[in-house]
Amino acid sequence: MQRIVSICPSNTEILWALGLGENVVGVDDYSDWPQQVADLPRLGPDLEIDMDRVQALRPDWVLASLSVPGMEKNIEALEQTGIPFLVLYPGGLEDIPRDFLRVARFAGLEQRGRKLADRFKKRLETIRQKIPQDRPAPRVYWEWWPKPVFTPGKENWLTDVSRTVGAINIFGEEEGQTVQSDWRTVAERRPDYVFAVWTGVPMKKVRKDKMMNRPEWKDLPCIRENRVYILDEGWYCRPSQRILTGIEHLAHLLYPDRFAPSDPDNPL
């Protein structure tokens, strides 16, 4: 049986979706889904993986990622170990089913990857077909980090997620995966909704009251009308099958007359 190490949370989730969970022998500190990962050896934060611990697990291969700036040093360190590895670098939403197939091929399970990718695409299309076309497109601001402000740009899956639900990412025309900005610029772009998905931060630690009281935002209708939502970053910041749960939840927030609440236990 192949021994696999995953050093990124979204990769861990993809391995489980492909039925390779029993092959995983170690994960990064932030991998927390599904529940079975709780008992696996931890190898450090996803930006500071301990390669000595990786080598000690004697993996047949490592599933790495470049989904977050700074992960490049993990790749450089892996190259020094001589352990075979596969690197995922998801940009848009369409890269997620492609990554299913890439991982499956690397594991010698191409047919399984094709089936998973097809299911992902079909469910995504089902969501798209239910989005109302006769309403103004809501303008949304995604907050990945508050200070300094980081938000998804043009080449980011959350821009595609916004488009999927008939919305417009107010930074969606800015080049790059991630854009650095400030609260005043956000206010000038007049979002209809604010979605906070602070990377690596549990929902309970995100202070909505402080967001609502930012002086730069005091005149925004979305603040006055309480259209500020703290969302589960695991549904939006990880390019895996669970992003479908996030998309369905977003659609429910925007169109409650069309979409029921999403089912977190059935991502795909």
Predicted regions mapped to residue ranges:
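N-terminal ligand-binding lobe of clamshell/alpha-beta domains
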Residues: 1-268
